[in-house]
Regions:
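Short, small/polar-rich motifs associated with maturation and membrane association
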Residues: 1-274, 286-288, 292-294, 308, ...
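Extracellular/periplasmic, surface-exposed regions of secreted and cell-surface proteins
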Residues: 26-28, 44, 52, 66, ...
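Beta-rich nucleic-acid/ligand-interaction surfaces
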Residues: 54-56, 542, 851
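Short, glycine/acidic-rich beta->alpha junctions
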Residues: 82, 90, 101-104, 113-117, ...
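A short beta-strand motif that forms part of the nucleic acid-binding face
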Residues: 114, 125, 139, 255-256, ...
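Conserved small-residue
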Residues: 134-215, 466, 581, 669, ...
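Outer-membrane beta-barrel transmembrane strand signature
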Residues: 189, 197-242, 247-253, 329-377, ...
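C-terminal beta-barrel architecture of Gram-negative outer-membrane proteins
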Residues: 839-901
């Protein structure tokens, strides 16, 4: 049986597109949240990791649909849609299964919340039989592995000197040979500290003739990355009790996770408690209740930078430090300011000591139900049941941050820099009430009819408060006594919002001879967030399935065990509009009002609306067609499914330009369309099966092609995204890197033409894609001419005539679209079992997406592979201070994010039952795993950047831009599972 919306079904009777992740899959991978368990194991689901402790990754089911509204799926925990809670609060060890509903015929049952897919999470319940106690504990050790080949201090000194020599600005006393006085001028500013003088003295030794011998290896190098990182250590413990009889069941669990990642100032703790109970006091009544409580503490050290510029954490700050800068004074104390060329860069070790950024979460998810079986009262009502679900979610968070005197001012306010404290509180509460009527009938063993009727109501509210203080009197008070600050406090802020939903739904499942299946669903949804007259809408769906293996002519083919064709169509909605957005928000402002003698003006506080109200704002709608085949052959040694889908989203929520005479520039409106088309394959093969040995492989492959079909006002381009009709939703639209200019006759001629047009390019610098230079005889129609100039700007007498095809303009015709989202993703899991031993390894891959992150200088450290006359195949440009065209150099940072990651290699041993009887245990297993042992890919991976890590990227655009070096963390996990 598998879980579907508002019920369960036999897997063979499912007509929609769905996938399942079981507790066995979760156990096989030591994950901290549910998303990690799904990565690469489910077709159509693209998940990227987030190595920051306690944080979720990013998830998309069958691509992006909306430009401005939410693209995240709906989570349903034990039948209750999640609004106030978070999937991060659910301990993965408490999860029995996760069903992922992907097409509209499956998700339309959730109406306005199903457009982005639905993930049904079922937690573990008590089981009938003997009472069991289980323990699962693991310890892991990890380290940050960077493959970036950075320059050491001596190499960086040579790099800077060569840059000045190439640019003709070195002017040393010994020609191009090292000159200590000139080198100091390259590195030091007039206000610099003396420690660099002492370090440079070791590099230069004066000879008897007054010249200097030079040994750059004597220049000390500080490994800043080593100083701010540590050996990661995580321990995770879970103990559970399961008991049950025919009339009652109970499941109780306690969990504890303590995670210390390689960054010294980041850690995460989570405490969870879960209880699920069910009693059957009579034959006609069943009552159940579940309560999941969690408390978590996250510490992230410095302020998280969510932009695409600047460091994101202490490691990013450390990588911005020059390698020649010492971390400590001679007396062993931390160096106060450790940057020679920019006093704003403080020693990141001080930041670790003087910065706290702690978030505490308290969460409760409550679910309950009561079910009446009317068939126990009266035989004609057999198969008729009434069920009431009541659920509530509460989440309270407190974010406290404190930045001491040694920390780089996070709020960019020099007048209020020291001892800054910030305190933010928020709480979210939601409740859901559902009444369901089930009617299940079988007629003459031929017809089966299952009817589900639903009435649902949901309410949500959130409120928050924040305050900030400067020059905190007692640093030890952190953010707990902001009122005692010596300086004027930042104006406190608060917020509040609430919304409600109401729904009515009907679903009919019909089966004919257990071969022909039909599912029809209709849901009528209302949402308070939308405008009057548009609050309610109807979302229908239908799906057909043909179980061909039940046909006699198929049963004659012995090697076919399962063959089911499915087709489904449905409409879902997305009402992800902020409350009150249809009415326009109001803020305070100052108005200048003339009055009195001489028309004197006075500033008076008034109010104004920020955005023009839209009283017709409605739903985004997605219509989806899905065609699928489920199959199993050779005694199900080979089984799987193939899916093809088209999803079209209309009435997108976008800001539309309006006449300024209205008093506003834009209005949020339902305009625009997008489309997703895709192909998915999941395959499970039992490659070898003998008495003692089994080899099984599970494959997933997903291809998604998303496009914008229409923008506001019929425009073909909108710079907001940027968005372009016919292109993916999340894209870069920019110039293209071609190669590095070479010192060849062909390149020199082309550079001469550019120089004569006012564009100076030099050998060893980046060449950007341009329209080709097509030289033609002078006077040719449609041609232009240019007089060639030499490097000094003097005319050489040579005239070049070329076609006016856009050459030398560098405009939109030279740009291209870079897709941030992958074109295809997948995973391969191989499992080898020999007697009581099991060895498995899981591979995850993503291809076809582009990143903006391949920088030659990550922070201020510079990679070695730079162009020179003897290294013409280099990865990066030649260093030079010469005047040249540099405004296009950034385009070199675009690179493919293709990657193949071996996520884990696991070895386990299950202790034989004959051994366990002697100690009274029912089960025992020991295991060891290696996480992220191998990462393969293109330039991005070779540069030491992990494309699977969200930490340093712009997550809002589902990966894309990055300036922080996000290395990969490799770990060894040791664990044991015991059952009694």
């Amino acid at each position: 049986m598998v879980v579907v919306g508002y019920g369960v079904q036999k897997k063979s009777d499912v007509t929609g597109a769905m996938a399942r992740v079981t507790s066995k899959v979760i156990e096989d991978r030591p994950v901290q949240n549910a998303l990690q368990a799904m990565q690469g194991r489910v077709t159509g689901v693209d998940i990227t990791s987030n190595n920051r402790p306690g944080e979720l990754g990013d998830i998309r089911i069958r691509g992006n649909r909306s430009l401005t509204a939410d693209n995240n799926p709906l989570y349903v925990i034990d039948g209750i849609p999640m609004s106030a809670g978070s999937i991060a609060d659910v301990n993965p060890s408490d999860i029995e299964s996760m069903e992922i509903l992907k097409d509209a015929s499956a998700t339309a049952i959730y109406g306005s919340r199903g457009a982005n897919g639905v993930i049904l999470v079922t937690t573990k319940k008590g089981k009938t039989g003997r009472t069991t106690i289980n323990y699962d504990g693991s310890f892991s050790f990890g380290f940050l592995d960077s493959t970036t080949d950075y320059m050491n201090s001596g190499q960086l000194l040579d790099y800077n000197r060569q840059s000045a020599i190439t640019g003709g600005t070195y002017n040393g006393r010994y020609g191009d040979n090292p000159d200590p006085e000139r080198d100091k001028a390259l590195w030091l500013n007039p206000n610099n500290m003396s420690y660099m003088d002492k370090r440079l003295e070791k590099v230069y030794q004066q000879n008897a003739d007054g010249t200097y011998s030079y040994d750059p290896s004597q220049l000390e190098t500080t490994d800043w990355g080593e100083l701010v990182t540590r050996t990661a250590f995580t321990h995770n413990h879970q103990i559970s009790l399961s008991a049950g009889t025919e009339t009652s069941k109970l499941y109780v669990s306690l969990g504890y996770l303590d995670q210390k990642v390689p960054m010294k100032d980041q850690d995460f703790k989570r405490y969870t408690a879960n209880i699920n109970g069910e009693i059957i006091p009579t034959k006609w009544l069943k009552v159940g209740m579940g309560l999941n409580a969690t408390h978590s503490i996250k510490n992230y050290g410095i302020v998280s930078n969510t932009s695409n510029t600047g460091a994101k954490d202490s490691y990013g700050l450390a990588m911005g430090m020059m390698p020649w800068v010492p971390a400590y004074n001679e007396d062993g104390s931390i160096l106060e300011v450790a940057s020679a060329d920019d006093q704003a860069y403080h020693n990141p070790l001080r930041n670790i000591d003087d910065a706290r950024n702690e978030t505490r979460y308290y969460g409760v998810n409550f679910s309950s139900y009561a079910e009446l079986d009317f068939g126990q009262f009266w035989e004609p009502l057999k198969g008729v049941k009434w069920r009431t679900n009541l659920g509530a979610q509460y989440r309270n968070s407190r974010v406290g941050s404190y930045y001491g005197e040694g920390y780089t001012n996070p709020f960019k306010n020099p007048a209020m820099a020291p001892n800054v404290a910030n305190n933010e509180h928020s709480q979210k509460l939601s409740w859901t009430l559902e009444n369901l009527l089930y009617i299940n009938k079988t007629i003459k063993d031929i017809h089966s009819v299952n009817i589900t009727l639903l009435q649902s109501a949901e309410r949500y509210r959130t409120e928050g408060l924040n305050m900030r203080g400067y020059e905190i009197t007692f640093p030890s008070s952190l953010w707990y006594n902001i009122g005692a600050s010596n300086n004027a406090k930042y104006a406190p802020g608060s917020n509040f919002s609430t919304w409600s939903r109401a729904s009515y739904m009907a679903r009919v499942n019909y089966g004919l001879m257990d071969k022909y299946l039909l599912t029809v669903t209709g849901r009528f949804d209302g949402a308070s967030m939308l405008a009057a007259g548009n609050k309610w809408d109807f979302f229908p769906s239908a799906a057909l399935a043909w179980r061909m293996e039940q046909e006699k002519w198929i049963q004659q083919i012995n090697w076919i065990n399962q063959l089911k064709l499915r087709v489904g169509y449905g409409v879902t909605g997305n009402s992800a509009v902020n409350p009150y957005q249809t009415a326009g928000s109001v803020t305070s402002t100052y108005a200048s009002i003339p009055f009195g003698v001489g028309n004197v003006s006075s500033n008076t506080i008034g109010t104004k609306t920020n955005i023009m109200p839209n009283y017709s704002l409605g739903w985004e709608k997605t219509s989806s067609l899905n065609v699928g085949v489920d199959f199993g052959v050779l005694e199900n040694r080979i089984s799987g499914s193939v899916e093809y889908y088209i999803a079209k989203t209309s009435d997108l929520l976008m800001n539309q330009s309006i006449p300024v005479i209205t008093g506003y520039a834009q209005i949020l409106n339902n305009v625009g369309k997008t489309e997703n088309r895709g192909f998915e394959v999941s395959l499970s093969t039992v490659n070898v099966k003998t008495k003692d040995f089994t080899w099984q492989t599970d494959w997933t492959f997903s291809l998604n092609n998303e496009k914008i079909k229409e923008l506001a006002g019929g425009a073909t381009y909108d710079s907001t995204g940027p968005w372009m009709v016919g292109e993916p939703l999340n894209s870069f639209y920019d110039f293209q890197y071609d190669r590095i200019w070479q010192n060849t006759q062909e390149d020199n001629h082309l550079m001469d033409v550019y120089r004569s047009l006012g564009l100076t390019f030099l050998p060893g610098q980046y060449k950007i894609v341009d329209q080709p230079l097509v030289e033609v005889p002078q006077g040719t129609e449609g041609s232009k001419t240019v007089e060639i100039k030499d490097a000094a700007g003097n005319k050489t007498g040579e005239v070049v005539s070329y076609m006016d095809n856009g050459f030398g303009k560098f405009d939109d015709n030279d740009k291209k679209i870079y897709n941030k989202s992958p074109k295809w993703t997948g995973g391969i899991n191989n499992s080898f079992t020999y007697k009581n031993w099991n060895l498995s390894f899981f591979t995850y891959f993503r291809f076809g997406n582009t990143y903006y992150g391949l920088t030659q200088t990550i922070g201020r450290r510079i990679e070695k592979d730079t162009w020179s006359p003897t290294n013409t195949d280099a990865k990066f440009a030649q260093p030079t201070t010469a005047t040249r065209e540099t405004k296009y150099d950034y385009v070199r940072n675009y690179t493919k994010g293709n990657m193949v990651l071996i996520k884990n290699i696991a070895l386990s041993y299950t202790v034989p039952q004959s051994w366990l009887k002697k100690c009274g245990a029912s089960s025992a297993q020991v295991y060891a795993q290696v996480l992220n042992p191998f990462l393969f890919g293109g330039e991005l991976v070779k540069a030491g950047i992990n494309p699977d890590d969200l930490t340093g990227w712009d997550a809002g655009n589902h990966i894309g831009g990055q300036t922080n070096n996000t290395c990969i963390t490799r770990s060894l996990v040791l664990g044991v599972r015991l059952g009694f």
